[in-house]
């Protein structure tokens, strides 16, 4: 006995928004899950790395200082030590704007990647908690049916002892109890399997007292309307978009035209400053032709085109999932209605047999 609860996985809005709209009784479990998840820690470290890397762009003008010293032995002049200290600072480049755009895209991509990891865990937890909730309801109904079936069996057995009922009636009543017990055992097995899935996905033990899922979560899912415009809010799609932009801006930096820097150089001979060789000024570098840089730019553009192609494919994939989602919703509604009808039919049968 298995009910499909995969509807949650196909929703294209962020389920994290649900957690922010009210106090949820399972929020502590969610927080613990986030803290214990190795995947989330890895994504958080990736974001920290991008934020550190962004300082290279923000402080592009910071001077670069280097020192160099050479020891020479000359038969006429004796031992000589030539030293040089050079400082340079970039003040303009035709690629600076693209560097900042790439930085922003990479940071946004890392943030989306972290959010996506959290969303996946949240989605998995909610999916399974909904499963537990429905199976618990079924288990409660099965328990009531079993109690009714036992009472019916006792009545039929009493009538059989009195010679009113037949032996076949007793066997049918016993068979009904066994069938209901089998269904109850199947339900309990499904619940334990779902708990195991939660532990596997989250890395933490499922609480013995259970996790309460508010009804408003299911209400929000039931009232969710499918809209293909919401595809653009899908985290996978947005992440591909940021990665594509980062690749594009990086490609545009590979073949820069002009670079202007402040440069100062101090030369020393045996620790004595050499004034005629020491200087400071502005250095302008113009890239007239560099085959390697042109190839690097073209390669970067190809990487951008690959990601754009993946975005188009992801859009079509999500659109197909939305259509499949509607079919899944209709199928699940019919399946659940069938289970409800079966339950009502069983109750009617038991009631009729009691009256008889």
Indicate residue ranges for each PLM-predicted region.
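Amphipathic alpha-helical coiled-coil/heptad-repeat segments
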Residues: 121, 134, 141-144, 189, ...
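Sec/SRP-type N-terminal targeting helices
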Residues: 41-45, 58-59, 91-118, 168, ...
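Bacterial Sec-pathway N-terminal export signals of envelope proteins
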Residues: 19-66, 164-168, 172, 199-252, ...
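Sec-dependent signal peptide recognition
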Residues: 2-10
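Periplasmic alpha-helical coiled-coil/stalk elements that build and connect Gram-negative outer-membrane
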Residues: 3, 120-233, 325-332, 336, ...
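A small-residue-enriched
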Residues: 31-92, 229-297, 302
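N-terminal signal peptide c-region/cleavage motif recognized by signal peptidases
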Residues: 14-15
């Amino acid at each position: 006995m298995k009910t499909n609860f995969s509807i949650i996985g196909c929703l294209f809005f962020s389920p994290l928004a649900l957690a922010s709209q009210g106090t949820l009784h399972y929020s502590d479990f969610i927080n613990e899950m986030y803290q214990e998840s190795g995947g989330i820690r890895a994504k958080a470290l990736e974001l920290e790395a991008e934020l550190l890397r962004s300082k290279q762009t923000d402080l592009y003008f910071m001077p670069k200082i280097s020192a160099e010293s050479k020891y020479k032995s000359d038969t006429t002049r004796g031992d000589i030590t030539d030293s040089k200290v050079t400082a340079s600072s970039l003040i303009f480049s035709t690629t600076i704007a693209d560097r900042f755009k790439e930085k922003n895209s990479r940071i946004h991509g890392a943030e989306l990647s972290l959010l996506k990891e959290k969303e996946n865990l949240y989605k998995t937890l909610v999916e399974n908690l909904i499963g537990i909730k429905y199976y618990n309801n079924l288990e409660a109904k099965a328990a009531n049916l079993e109690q009714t079936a036992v009472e019916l069996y006792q009545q039929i057995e009493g009538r059989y002892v009195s010679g009113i009922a037949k032996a076949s009636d007793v066997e049918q009543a016993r068979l009904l109890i066994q069938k209901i017990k089998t269904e109850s055992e199947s339900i309990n097995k499904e619940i334990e399997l779902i708990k195991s899935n939660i532990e596997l996905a989250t890395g933490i033990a499922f609480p013995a007292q259970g996790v309460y899922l508010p009804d408003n979560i299911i209400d929000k899912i039931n009232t969710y309307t499918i809209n293909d415009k919401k595809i653009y809010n899908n985290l996978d799609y947005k992440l591909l978009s940021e990665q594509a932009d980062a690749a594009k801006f990086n490609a545009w930096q590979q073949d820069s035209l002009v670079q202007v820097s402040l440069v100062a150089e101090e030369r020393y001979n045996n620790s004595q400053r050499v004034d005629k060789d020491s200087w400071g000024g502005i250095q302008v570098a113009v890239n007239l032709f560099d085959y390697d840089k042109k190839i690097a730019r073209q390669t970067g553009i190809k990487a951008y085109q690959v990601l754009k192609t993946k975005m188009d494919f992801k859009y079509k994939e999500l659109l197909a999932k939305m259509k499949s989602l509607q079919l899944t919703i209709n199928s699940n509604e019919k399946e659940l209605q069938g289970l409800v009808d079966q339950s009502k039919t069983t109750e009617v049968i038991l009631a009729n047999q009691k009256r008889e």
